[in-house]
Amino acid sequence: FLNINQLQAQNLKLDQSMGQAGLLQVQQMIGLYEDENLQKYVSKVGQRLVSKLGEQPFQYRFYVLDMAEPNAFALPAGYIFVSRGILALTNTEDELACILGHEIMHVHKRHSIQQSKKSVIPSILQIPGAVVGSVAGETIGNIIGAPASITSGLILSSYSRVHETEADELGTALAVSAGYNPKAMPAVLNRLHNEVTFIEGKNME
């Protein structure tokens, strides 16, 4: 039988392989937004949040995607993505911190790995900019399109409502611990809801 340390090492290796494979596909299919100042800003806020998590088994990395639609998502092993579209909807650093906190917690709690163990039917990688059909929920992940994908044979599925709610609550708490205003979360959620509703309306015309 494997001991705890061996199991943890296997889990970390799985996270890293899924994250690296997903990063390559995202870079190829979507592309990164080449704005050094914007990238530094997002990374600065992200690392400020990560510093409040304590010691971590991997390095968190933050990327700005060249995508006009509002979106944010995370891959295992600390790969966090935000689109230039969602950055355009954030009015303050506090709002960005709440969005990043949400995605960081998906990684920290290994939600992708947990979800992939539920025998979800795999699908071809979908560009995360595709807006989800329902915006009735109140979590970030229920408003913007979390990616349902398969990377190198490993399933990455959409998160459950329980995982989304947990990421919202813990992500906001993480933002508060880093000195950010928790009231930014409902503000940015409302703005995202309105924007996605507008996009869906345009797509139906």
Positions of predicted regions on the chain:
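Short, conserved phosphate-binding/catalytic loop or strand-edge motifs used
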Residues: 142-151, 191-193
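Peri-catalytic and regulatory segments of divalent metal-dependent proteins
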Residues: 2-136, 153-156, 168-205
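Short-chain dehydrogenase/reductase
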Residues: 157, 161
